[in-house]
């Protein structure tokens, strides 16, 4: 399909990414994972040493409303990128921030946004080491984040196998309760799952279970069976919202059945675990009509 022959609304986010990156080439001796995972992964100098790169943007009117707390806007900008590191089991190292801002923006508001950034950076030991400012029609922040795995491999989306059980952390569907501004990235949980070699595949739920589980299945080349009754809905959320609203930032991961007892016995975090299905060798996605969309930046909903 020629790019000019289709609109973004029809192509969708996944289609656009494929169109733009289909001809990219990487050096496998240096690059473990590129387009298609939560972060890009480069091989480090030592054995089992990896560097992870992530860039993520928050835009006024898309990721936050004009009247939201500026401290929480800054917090969310970094927390989103941290969640992607968590999804691969990595520890954060440093970040640079690009700020796009209208020339009549309040300096007090900008100062509060950066206070929120600094607070969460301190909490998760992220060094804020630079950035850029640019005039823009509307406020946005872009975070470029560096992480690392030392002594263990990051968890990719592509490692799930038929028979692996599907787990999520926490509860889903709390976007309307402002959890998208207040969530905690599951860094400790993700790193533990990677170090213990328990998760066979993993990602974070940024666009919703309805969009992200099919992505993980496609990356692994298999399908899935969902137990809809087991999906953990946040208080006040419907099943449809839990599946499709997005911005949960919980971990979605798969586990070999032989490791599930170890997972449950050694899981020492307050974050609850929920088994919601199993990866399968047959296509059963068509039996799941509630997997409607998830969030897509471009498709009409």
Annotate the PLM regions.
Residues 104, 181-248, 280, 289:
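Active-site-proximal betaalpha loop/short-helix elements
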Residues 3, 8, 184, 196, ...:
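Acidic, Ser/Thr/Pro-rich beta/coil linker or hinge segments at domain junctions
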Residues 41, 81, 89, 128, ...:
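Residue-level signal for inorganic ion chemistry
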Residues 146-148, 252-256:
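Short hydrophobic/aromatic beta-strand micro-patches
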Residues 51, 58, 91-176, 278:
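Glycine-rich anion-binding loops of enzyme active sites
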Residues 1-69, 88, 97, 112-120, ...:
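Extreme N-terminal cap/leader segments of soluble proteins
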Residues 70-94, 115-123, 192, 210-216:
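Small-aliphatic-rich amphipathic alpha-helix that forms the alpha element of a beta-alpha
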Residues 107-108, 154, 258-265:
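Short, conserved charged micro-motifs
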């Amino acid at each position: 399909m020629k790019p000019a022959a289709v609109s973004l609304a029809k192509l969708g986010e996944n289609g656009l990414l494929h169109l733009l990156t289909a001809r990219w080439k990487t050096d496998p001796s240096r690059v473990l994972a590129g387009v298609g995972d939560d972060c890009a992964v480069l091989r480090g100098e030592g054995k089992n040493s990896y560097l992870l790169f992530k860039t993520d943007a928050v835009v006024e009117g898309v990721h936050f409303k004009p009247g939201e707390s500026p401290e929480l806007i800054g917090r969310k900008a970094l927390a989103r990128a941290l969640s992607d590191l968590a999804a691969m089991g990595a520890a954060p190292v440093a970040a640079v921030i690009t700020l796009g801002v209208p020339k009549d923006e309040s300096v007090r508001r900008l100062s509060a946004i950066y206070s929120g950034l600094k607070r969460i950076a301190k909490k998760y030991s992220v060094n804020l080491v630079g950035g850029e400012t640019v005039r823009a029609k509307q406020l946005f922040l872009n975070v470029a984040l560096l992480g690392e795995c030392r002594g263990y491999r990051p968890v990719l989306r592509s490692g799930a196998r038929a028979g692996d059980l599907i787990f999520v952390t926490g509860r889903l569907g709390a976007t309307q309760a402002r959890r998208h501004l207040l969530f905690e990235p599951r860094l400790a949980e993700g790193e533990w799952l990677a170090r213990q070699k328990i998760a066979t595949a993993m990602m974070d739920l940024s666009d919703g279970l309805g969009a992200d589980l099919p992505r993980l299945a496609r990356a692994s080349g298999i399908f899935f069976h969902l137990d809809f009754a087991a999906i953990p809905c946040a208080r006040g959320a419907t099943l449809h919202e839990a599946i499709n609203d997005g911005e949960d930032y919980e971990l979605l991961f798969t586990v070999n059945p032989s490791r599930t007892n170890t997972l449950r016995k050694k899981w020492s975090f307050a974050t609850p675990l929920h088994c919601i299905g199993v990866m399968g060798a047959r296509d059963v996605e068509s039996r799941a009509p509630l997997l409607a969309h998830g969030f897509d930046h471009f498709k009409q909903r």
